[in-house]
Design a protein with these regions (language model features):
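Active-site segments that bind and position negatively charged phosphate/pyrophosphate groups
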Residues: 204-323
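Short alpha-helical scaffolding segments that buttress acidic/His motifs in well-ordered protein cores
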Residues: 194-198, 240-251, 289, 324, ...
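Short Gly/Thr/Asp-enriched flexible loops that form oxyanion-binding sites at enzyme active sites
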Residues: 79, 98-112, 144-145
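Residues at alpha-helix caps and immediate loop-helix transition turns in enzyme cores, especially N-
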Residues: 44-46, 74, 101, 303, ...
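A glycine/threonine-rich phosphate-anchoring loop and its flanking beta-alpha core
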Residues: 111-208
Length: 379
């Protein structure tokens, strides 16, 4: 195991009916209440949150309309509103898009320049508004990490930020809040969580990490089984709970602590698909990841052999890739470029867009030609 420092200050409050307690943690504060397209008003979560805020005399200003691929223009608008209203914290009620937007707004609140400076490494995040979360969609683990991803609509760049100040203070994880999540969003969340786990698993440089390998394999198996249960029984509490906590653990730093250097090449390519064509994040990964595995099949032969055996009970690296791709397809996730409306003629534009993020992330071996070659496996 490699040396590491594990730091994660987010307090998790997990369980049924915990949403009603959010006001207790915000007592005496004035918060910016963020949410997405309004589904929380249809499923009752909005009413629970507002009732709790009023019970504990929490002042709040609402801002809704966050898109599945959150955009910079919203961050600008909401940051201006937060300053105007003298906000002292942010409450994000939603999934990764809402939480990521909250983090960008929190970072921009105290910064005199353009918040995009943080995304292009022109400035470092030194201070941010405190963030509180009521999770309604399991996928990104943004509820328990310090990262955020935002799309700049003008430059067509989907970039990320990270900083200790962006860890949420408290995140409420109530599995019942996910009972009404549509099947396509369940599928996207499942893919996202699995790829979060497997990027490190397949790209790590240090070989002897049995604890981390076991974590990843168990979590992937749990996500697969709970996803299948959820699609059959949307209100199966245990399935929702297992899925929710697995997705959080997939990117809260625990599974990668001690594995040494690792990378996220599939997220890099997926971000370009989202930036250019506004494709859901999970859908980009279900297309790109099997293609990346096929491209690297020989290089990853030993890892694929173990993955196939431990996760699917098979002893064949090609079949291991096929089984994962088959699972993605079985839950309704796209696995080919044509499934998201793209063809070979789009590959060059995606590869060109991805190069800048590859360079930002230090993935210099991912040239335009290499990225294009990988994407051809998704035709």
């Amino acid at each position: 195991m490699k040396e590491f420092v594990f730091y994660n200050p987010t307090q998790i409050v997990f369980g049924e009916n915990q949403t009603k307690n959010i006001g207790r943690y915000l007592k005496g504060k004035k918060c910016l209440f963020l949410y997405g397209g309004g589904s929380i008003k249809q499923n009752g979560i909005y009413d629970k949150v507002v009732e709790s805020l009023k019970k504990y005399n929490v002042l709040f200003v609402e801002k809704s309309g966050i898109k599945p691929n959150p955009v910079l223009s919203f961050v600008y608008e909401a940051t201006e509103l937060a300053n105007k209203e003298n906000i002292d914290c942010i409450l994000a009620v939603g999934g990764g898009s809402v939480i990521d937007s909250a983090k960008a707004i929190a970072a921009g609140f105290y910064y005199d320049g353009d918040v995009w400076d943080f995304f292009i490494d022109k400035a470092q995040i030194k201070q941010a508004l405190p963030i509180y979360v009521v999770l309604t969609l399991s996928a990104t683990a943004s509820e328990m990490n310090s990262g955020a991803v935002i799309t700049n609509e003008k430059t067509k760049q989907k970039f990320n930020i990270r900083g200790d100040a962006l860890f949420p203070k408290i995140s409420i994880l109530d599995p019942t809040n996910t009972y009404t999540v549509p099947k396509n969003q369940v599928a996207n969340g499942s893919v996202d969580a699995i790829v979060h786990l497997l990027e490190g698993y397949f790209t790590k440089q240090y070989p002897n990490t049995p604890i981390q390998d076991g974590f990843v394999e168990t979590l992937v198996k749990t996500i697969i089984s709970s996803t299948n249960q959820i699609l059959e029984e949307p209100q199966n509490y245990d399935a929702r709970a297992n899925f929710m906590w697995s997705a959080t653990l997939a990117l809260n730093g625990l599974t990668t602590a001690g594995i040494g250097a690792y990378a996220f090449p599939n997220h890099m390519m997926g971000h370009s698909l989202s930036a250019l064509y506004d494709i859901a994040h999970g859908s980009t990964l279900s297309v790109v990841f099997p293609a990346w595995l096929k491209y690297n099949k020989d290089k990853l032969a030993q890892r694929l052999q173990r993955f196939g055996k431990e996760v699917f009970g098979i002893d064949n690296q090609t079949r291991a890739i096929e089984k994962l791709e088959d699972f993605f397809a079985s839950i309704g996730a796209p696995t080919k470029l044509k499934d998201v409306g793209l063809s070979q003629s789009d590959i060059e534009a995606v590869a060109q867009n991805a190069v800048s993020l590859a360079q930002k992330w230090g993935l210099n071996e991912y040239t335009k030609d290499k990225i294009a070659s990988i994407l051809k496996f998704a035709l």
